[in-house]
């Protein structure tokens, strides 16, 4: 070991020679040393991102603001090692004063034990101080006392009450004529407003005049409570105490937040007074003229002095502090109607003054909304007594519940808690206080008053998730859900927001005795007595519930449904359930058209004209948030504020054009528009858009997004007891449970069809509106429901994942497989009473009866006029009598502009040897295909002499059947089947009547030559109807669009340009194929961009070349007279490339 004063020698142990060496091993050499990486201390690594540490010129370090810090920004709590006594006091010592009075010291000597707040330097002068340190509970916090601009160093000093406990002086104001205590140096008035205000009764100092006013009113209350003989003594300390210059006087105990006055039990029959810590931070400014105020206060002649009774003497001090013209405080200031100097009277005095002065001022100025806000938690109250009662909750909680160890600040709160929470052995007769609105019962009257059930709309809205609540207490409970889940159940590890809820949940896992104290639950241990709640059974139906409260709610369902929805007629047991139900109707307004919306609004008693001026505003997240910028009035609910600005200021607010709701705030309106998916590119709306990063769905609040994300976790903890289906959320399970009921309470206003769930009704309404949000990526077909789109997509893949283990049959859907299994298990139990056909499920039987046996209005075949009575008969007729006809209808061209030019004045059919027959198209029947006449095959000599009518709507001609050039086996002569029919109904742009229609005469008929291996069995014709709506005209040009049906490949092709692709023959097919062709012309027409342009390889649709052999030049048909002037189609134009989609 080295001697004292010498450097310590580091010895290194060598494993090889088993010796210590002071430098290096003589045989193996030096040791390679690896040092740790540099790690910031805890104090420096915990620095917030908007702060930074800078080194000053004198070498010291300070904390500086990077961004703007507004006033009343709180930092903390201060973290450090806590000791009973300091070894060495720091430059800014901190203590925490416990309930028993013993202080605990903060050891700030080590940066690794503290957070960044230890690096903030204390202020030396008052103008340098911008942070205030104070104790709250068992921690110390820093709060900004003014706005701090970027680049300013943070400097801290003690708050007034905390400085008194720490026995530290307040900082003095440098360069002003006011002492640190706020007492003027001389009697001359100070021009500038002092930064601190002093009480002339007890010399307490205050940073704000408002705090001094409320403090003086406390002295007034004390003077009023003293007997008459003692009042002279109460007014004695009116002299200004001589204080040494630069040394402030000791701050009295009255300046502490947790004052003795707050800890006193309030006297019976008297409202507790408001201490200075309870001062309102949001005060309504009074805009009444100052002359009127002077007139109110003038109760004495101008020259008559005022008697100096103690209460009036203190009120003299109050008014003297508020009068800018006052220079003598020995008497009440004299106000006259003709004073030239203006009088400034703070609204805080009007709101807080007592007795006659307060009554007189309120009587003259009129009642105004009063706002009282807690200094500590910023909670708002409507009156000072509630604020006084609330502030005590931030102080010491001396009353402990013996049952659950919960602490209370008032004994009354403890009694109410014990009576309400721990009276489980009382009989049901003790529930004698019943709510007249929802019929909920309570044991004590105060619990009924706290219940505060409302019958009007939910007006309290959460700022996080925008959810509405009927009472402020329910909103406060709900807000805790947005915090962290800190309490875990020891049995199942489930997390909770509140400890009391966790303990109640944990009791459900326990078995044994009936009563268990919460101390035993918190202590835990192996010897913990098990407890289980005694179940409660319904006396009507016998259903068992885990607790009596749930049973009481269920018991209401056996009573009469007294509350009826005026919109849909549905009845409810409780009015709060009815109120929630009415909100569902408003959610579906967006799916209605203008007529339906007007009818709906009229049904609920609001007209659209009145809606512009008298619409209600959804309530805000917290009462008293709305403040009118013009008259400074505040409102507790949004509809009150909206009514105010409409009636008083003649403003209309912000109205939603979709659902006709109106909002007073623009921010609320923008958040509402996210629901309708409107104005999403607007930056004002985008800040309310919260997209899901997994599926891309957007929400207008973080709370709704977080609830949605539960679906993506894959955890489905809520299972249906009837079918076993699981869900991620409890509300989804409740919605699903309606599926098992046979009650279809949700009726469609369009068709009257009943739905079991609101979700199903919303999707059903989309069908009536034609809203199809989901598109197949393969064929671009759109669907209204996602489940139908997913089922459709499986047809493209051909994957069948589900197999019946009994017979081996595979299915693409699980529900289809489950239905099939019923054949093996229960058999076909449902028999048709008409034809004795049997089915597995009742639904299949109902569909059979509906389609087969139910008589409907007689339907006529559009081709031959045959009338049938059922849909099944019509399908059977078309299948047997007209197998060659395929109808393709275009019913909706809403996406096209008003005037459209389609690059297709004709639709040509490329087929072997076709014959087109004339059809009589009835006038005024727009969109219906003409009846098909009988097929006629004329001989060539008859064709030549056949006259062509001049007024024919369609050209009629026949061509001689030609043989195929290649060998196609026995199918050569039968390849040409029935006549190809093309019926096109278009709006005539030359006719003014929109309902008129003309036949398209420019039909291209092209015989084709196929390869030897190509086989045809049944070439199906096309009937195209409703190509345009009666309100819209289409301008046509002379270009030709040809549609080809390939029966081998089963695809439809378009011809519009020369064939420039070499085609290879196809292999021979084994058997002829009969193909049913479907072509979506709506997709074709709407996808041409720009309209009128030629189709090309760069078309938005996916096109592929279809093999085709060289096309023979067509034989020209005999053209009718009206077609004589049209140009003939050249042979080279017939050799076109075919594209399939």
From Swiss-Prot:
Comp. bias (Basic and acidic residues): 236-245
MF-aspect GO terms: DNA-binding transcription activator activity, RNA polymerase II-specific; methyltransferase activity; promoter-specific chromatin binding; RNA polymerase II cis-regulatory region sequence-specific DNA binding; zinc ion binding
Predominant location category: nucleus
Zinc finger (C2H2-type): 197-219, 372-394, 399-422, 460-482, 487-509, 536-558, 563-585, 626-649, 654-676, 690-712, 718-740, 746-768, 774-796, 802-824, 830-853, 859-882
Biased segments, Acidic residues type: 609-620
Biological function: Sequence-specific DNA-binding transcriptional regulator. Plays a role as a molecular node in a transcriptional network regulating embryonic development and cell fate decision. Stimulates the expression of upstream key transcriptional activators and repressors of the Wnt/beta-catenin and MAPK/ERK pathways, respectively, that are essential for naive pluripotency and self-renewal maintenance of embryonic stem cells (ESCs). Specifically promotes SPRY1 and RSPO1 transcription activation through recognition and direct binding of a specific DNA sequence in their promoter regions.
Species this protein is from: Homo sapiens
Family: Belongs to the class V-like SAM-binding methyltransferase superfamily.
UniProt KW Repressor keyword: yes
Biased composition (Low complexity): 1121-1141
Expression tissues: Detected in all tissues examined.
Skewed-composition ranges (Basic residues): 262-274, 927-938
Entry's transmembrane regions: none
PANTHER family recorded: GROWTH FACTOR INDEPENDENT 1 TRANSCRIPTIONAL REPRESSOR, ZINC FINGER PROTEIN
UniProt cross-link Glycyl lysine isopeptide (Lys-Gly) (interchain with G-Cter in SUMO2), position: 517
GO biological process annotation, one example: methylation
Name of the protein in its database record: PR domain zinc finger protein 15
Stored InterPro entries: PRDM15_PR-SET, SET_dom, SET_dom_sf, Znf_C2H2_sf, Znf_C2H2_type
CDD domains: PR-SET_PRDM15
Keywords: Activator, Developmental protein, DNA-binding, Isopeptide bond, Metal-binding, Methyltransferase, Nucleus, Repeat, Repressor, S-adenosyl-L-methionine, Transcription, Transcription regulation, Transferase, Ubl conjugation, Zinc, Zinc-finger
């Amino acid at each position: 070991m080295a001697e004292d004063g010498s450097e310590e020698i580091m010895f290194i142990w060598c494993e090889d020679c088993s010796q210590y060496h002071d430098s290096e091993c003589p045989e193996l050499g030096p040791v390679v040393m690896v040092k740790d990486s540099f790690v910031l201390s805890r104090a420096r690594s915990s620095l917030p991102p908007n702060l930074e540490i800078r080194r000053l010129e004198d070498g010291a370090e300070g904390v500086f603001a990077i961004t703007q810090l507004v006033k009343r920004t709180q930092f903390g709590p201060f973290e450090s090692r806590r000791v009973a006594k300091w070894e060495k006091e720091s430059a800014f010592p901190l203590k925490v004063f416990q309930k028993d009075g013993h202080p605990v010291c903060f050891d700030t000597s080590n940066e690794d034990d503290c957070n960044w707040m230890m690096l903030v330097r204390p202020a030396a002068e008052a103008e340098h101080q911008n942070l205030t340190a104070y104790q709250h509970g068992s921690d110390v916090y820093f709060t900004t006392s003014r706005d701090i601009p970027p680049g300013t160093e943070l400097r801290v000093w003690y708050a007034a009450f905390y400085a008194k406990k720490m026995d530290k002086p307040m900082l003095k104001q440098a360069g002003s004529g006011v002492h640190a205590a706020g007492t003027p140096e001389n009697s001359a008035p100070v021009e500038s407003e002092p930064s601190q205000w002093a009480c002339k009764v007890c010399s307490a100092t205050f940073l704000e005049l408002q705090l001094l006013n409320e403090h003086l009113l406390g002295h007034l209350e004390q003077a009023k409570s003293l007997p008459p003989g003692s009042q002279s003594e109460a007014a004695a300390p009116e002299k200004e105490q001589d204080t040494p210059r630069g040394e402030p006087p000791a701050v009295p105990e009255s300046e502490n937040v947790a004052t003795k006055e707050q800890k006193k039990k309030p006297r019976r029959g008297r409202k507790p007074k408001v201490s200075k810590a309870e001062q309102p931070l949001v005060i309504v400014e009074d805009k009444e003229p100052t002359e009127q105020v002077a007139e109110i206060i003038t109760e004495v002649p101008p020259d008559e002095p005022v008697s100096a009774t103690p209460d009036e003497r203190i009120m003299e001090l109050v008014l003297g502090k508020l009068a800018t013209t006052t220079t003598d405080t020995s008497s009440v200031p004299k106000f006259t109607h003709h004073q030239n100097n203006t009088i400034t009277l703070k609204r805080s005095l009007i709101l807080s003054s007592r007795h006659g002065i307060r009554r007189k001022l309120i009587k003259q100025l009129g009642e105004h909304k009063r706002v009282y806000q807690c200094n500590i938690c910023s909670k708002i109250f409507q009156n000072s007594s509630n604020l006084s009662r609330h502030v005590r909750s931030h102080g010491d909680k001396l009353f402990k519940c013996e049952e659950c160890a919960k602490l209370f600040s008032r004994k009354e709160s403890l009694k109410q808690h014990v009576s309400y929470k721990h009276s489980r052995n009382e009989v049901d007769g003790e529930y004698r206080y019943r709510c007249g609105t929802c019929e909920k019962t309570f044991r004590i009257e105060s619990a009924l008053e706290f219940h505060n059930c409302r019958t009007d709309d939910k007006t309290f809205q959460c700022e996080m998730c925008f959810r509405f609540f009927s009472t402020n207490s329910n909103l406060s409970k709900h807000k805790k859900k947005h915090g962290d889940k800190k309490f875990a159940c020891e049995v199942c590890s489930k997390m909770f927001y509140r400890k009391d809820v966790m303990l109640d949940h944990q009791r459900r896992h326990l078995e044994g005795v009936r009563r268990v104290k919460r101390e035993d639950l918190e202590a835990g241990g192996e010897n913990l007595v098990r407890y289980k709640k005694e179940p409660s059974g319904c006396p009507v139906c016998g259903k068992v519930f885990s607790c009596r409260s749930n049973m009481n709610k269920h018991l209401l369902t056996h009573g009469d449904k007294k509350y009826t929805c005026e919109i849909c007629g549905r009845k409810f047991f409780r009015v709060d359930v009815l109120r929630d139900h009415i909100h569902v109707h408003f959610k579906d307004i967006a799916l209605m058209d203008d007529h339906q919306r007007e009818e709906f609004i009229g049904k609920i008693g609001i007209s659209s004209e009145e809606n512009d001026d008298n619409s209600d505003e959804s309530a805000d997240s917290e009462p008293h948030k709305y403040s009118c910028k013009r008259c400074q009035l505040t409102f507790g609910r949004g509809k009150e504020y909206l009514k105010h600005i409409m009636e008083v200021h003649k403003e209309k607010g912000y109205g939603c054009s979709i659902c006709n709701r109106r909002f007073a705030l623009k921010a609320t309106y923008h958040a509402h528009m996210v629901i309708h998916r409107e104005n999403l590119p607007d930056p004002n709306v985008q800040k309310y858009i919260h997209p899901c990063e997994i599926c891309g769905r957007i929400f207008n609040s973080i709370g709704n997004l977080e609830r949605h994300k539960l679906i993506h976790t894959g955890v489905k903890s809520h299972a249906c007891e009837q079918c076993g289906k699981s869900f991620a959320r409890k509300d989804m399970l409740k919605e699903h449970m309606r599926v098992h009921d046979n009650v279809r309470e949700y009726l469609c206003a369009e068709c009257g069809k009943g739905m079991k769930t609101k979700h199903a009704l919303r999707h059903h309404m989309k069908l009536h509106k034609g809203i199809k949000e989901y598109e197949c990526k393969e064929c671009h077909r759109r669907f209204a429901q996602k489940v139908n789109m997913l089922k459709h997509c499986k047809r493209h893949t051909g994957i069948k994942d589900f197999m019946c283990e009994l017979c081996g049959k595979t299915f693409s859907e699980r529900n289809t497989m489950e239905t099939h299994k019923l054949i093996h298990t229960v058999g076909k139990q449902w028999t048709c009473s008409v034809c004795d056909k049997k089915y597995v499920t009742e639904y299949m039987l109902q569909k059979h009866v509906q389609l087969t046996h139910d008589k409907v209005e007689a339907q006529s075949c559009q081709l031959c006029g045959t009338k049938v009575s059922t849909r099944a008969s019509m399908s059977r007729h078309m299948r047997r009598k007209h197998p060659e006809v395929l109808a393709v209808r275009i019913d909706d061209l809403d996406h096209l502009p008003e005037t459209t030019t389609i690059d297709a004045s004709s639709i040509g059919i490329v087929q072997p040897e076709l014959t087109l027959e004339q059809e009589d198209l009835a006038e005024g029947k727009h969109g219906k295909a003409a009846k098909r006449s009988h097929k006629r095959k004329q001989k060539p000599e008859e064709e030549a002499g056949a006259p062509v009518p001049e007024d024919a709507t369609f050209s009629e001609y026949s061509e001689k059947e030609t043989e195929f050039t290649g060998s196609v086996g026995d199918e050569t002569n039968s390849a040409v089947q029935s006549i190809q029919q093309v019926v096109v109904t278009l709006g005539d742009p030359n006719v003014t009547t929109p309902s008129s229609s003309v036949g398209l005469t420019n039909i291209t008929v092209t015989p084709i030559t196929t390869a030897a291996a190509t086989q045809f069995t049944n070439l199906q014709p096309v009937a195209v109807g409703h190509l345009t709506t009666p309100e819209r005209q289409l301008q046509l040009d002379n270009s030709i669009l040809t549609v080809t049906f390939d029966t081998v490949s089963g695809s439809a092709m378009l011809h519009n340009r020369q064939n420039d692709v070499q085609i290879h023959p196809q292999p021979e097919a084994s058997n002829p194929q009969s193909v049913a062709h479907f072509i979506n012309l709506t997709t074709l027409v709407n996808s041409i961009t720009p309209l009128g342009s030629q189709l090309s390889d760069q078309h938005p649709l996916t096109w592929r070349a279809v093999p085709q052999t060289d096309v023979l030049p067509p034989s020209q048909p005999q053209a009718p007279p009206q077609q004589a002037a049209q140009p003939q189609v050249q042979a080279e134009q017939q050799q076109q490339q075919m594209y399939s989609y």
